[in-house]
Amino acid sequence: MIKLEQVVEILKKDNNFREISSAGEYYFNWPKEVNFDQLSYDSRKSTKDTLFFAKGLNFKKEYLTDLEAAFYVSEFDYEVALPAIIVTDVKRAMALIAANFYKFPQNKLKTLALTGTKGKTTSAYFAKSILDKMNGGKTALLSTAQTTLDGQNYFKSELTTPESLDLLEMMAKALENGMTHLVMEVSSQAYKTERVYGLTFDVGVFLNISPDHIGPVEHPTLEDYFYCKRQLLKNSRYFVANAEMNHFAIIKEELNERKIPHAFYGADSENKIIESKGLHFVTDGSVSGEFDIRLLGRFNQENALATALATKALGASFENIRQGLASAIVPGRMELLTAKNGAHIYIDYAHNGLSLENLVEVVEDHHAGQLFLVLGSTGNKGESRRKDFGQVIENHPRLNVILTTDDSNRENPKTIADEIASFVSRELDFELDREFAIKKAISKTQNSDDAVIIAGKGADMFQLKDGKREPYIGDSPAAQKYL
């Protein structure tokens, strides 16, 4: 429960309160006592004791006409019968009010937040596995792929970083379930849309940056994308950053100026990988020793080093780190299947140019035969990825490519595929039925020298079409049918 008086006080302290509007009158303080038993931004879940948040570009006045709620919070006075708390920024208001409503669960959990263009989910699972070794399995996880609030039962995530109201509720539930630590991915959109406003993380990690999510729906420019991601820096008590990432200089400069304790990793830093072979690697620095992970590729080893440094800052021992990394399983990340003829099938969530480039390089290094790539791209978001995908394909002439459907949403998947193909000088194959595209690629393999890469969906069991998630067999189950 939270009182209206408390809500107004929170907003005033944040310089985010304009007035209360009711029946044509305006109030700086409401004359009566009002208690809210629930917070919601979903009209279907609102009750007479709900404080409702009217947010979103597509919000309409009619949504409030028959709404059952006590008050609504908005940047705009819709002049309906329901009393309104008018604010400057409804998203910031929701974040701070939710934190108070759920009794500040973020202060009772040890939190580790990860950002970067690629590798967030893999690193999140690495970190959870390490912390579980330290705390006996009391680590909650919020990732792009899955969410667990009790450390054991997982459900599909809706967003990389949930809306602030949902996020604070999840944190509170994690505490109720006896969790002591939380690992979460923080997207650039989370900062752009104030989903993590008011939160300070115990440890923040910045893995890398490359052009992605650039488009009219997400970030207009790379600068905006990078700036939003950098907000994690000043909202972390300790910070881990990749010294080899693009534009590292400004990160180093800002960390030093803000006097935030930190650790860097990479070839030219104190913490580095000095030996790498297959699934085994050796590190030097503050976490020095030999490690094994279940994923191929140096970039995965670099992510492992980043999480080793981050979890060490939370108290993990060398053995916690070594055992945690060795046992970590990441769904939809370089999942490996073997066909009857010995060919390897790699299923990976790689959904931007940088992650696809790294994935292709690893597979090329391990397979001398034919290489097949099954790939699509999302519709109505991340439009810049299509050019990036085309350039990766162009730069790797060994790839036999079958362009297919990803989460096409409200765009024509053939139009998306054609755009990818426009950046490639050689002929590509098209099969818009994703399962048949997978079948076709596997059927073309001959022996253990060959490999198929199925990229973009990972462990997703749906395809986004016309704004709705439609059931999809999943890349792994589809591939298993045709091995």
From Swiss-Prot:
According to its UniProt entry, one GO biological process term is: cell division
Q: Where in the cell is it found?
A: Cytoplasm
Superkingdom per UniProt: Bacteria
Q: How is it modified after translation?
A: Carboxylation is probably crucial for Mg(2+) binding and, consequently, for the gamma-phosphate positioning of ATP.
What is the enzyme's main class?
ligase
What Enzyme Commission number(s) appear in the record?
6.3.2.-
* Record GO cellular component, one term: cytoplasm
Q: Which UniProt keywords apply?
A: ATP-binding, Cell cycle, Cell division, Cell shape, Cell wall biogenesis/degradation, Cytoplasm, Ligase, Nucleotide-binding, Peptidoglycan synthesis
Q: Name one GO molecular function term.
A: acid-amino acid ligase activity
Q: Which family does the similarity line name?
A: Belongs to the MurCDEF family. MurE subfamily.
Q: Which HAMAP family match?
A: MurE
What name has this protein been given in UniProt? Answer: UDP-N-acetylmuramyl-tripeptide synthetase
Source species of the chain: Lactococcus lactis subsp. cremoris (strain SK11)
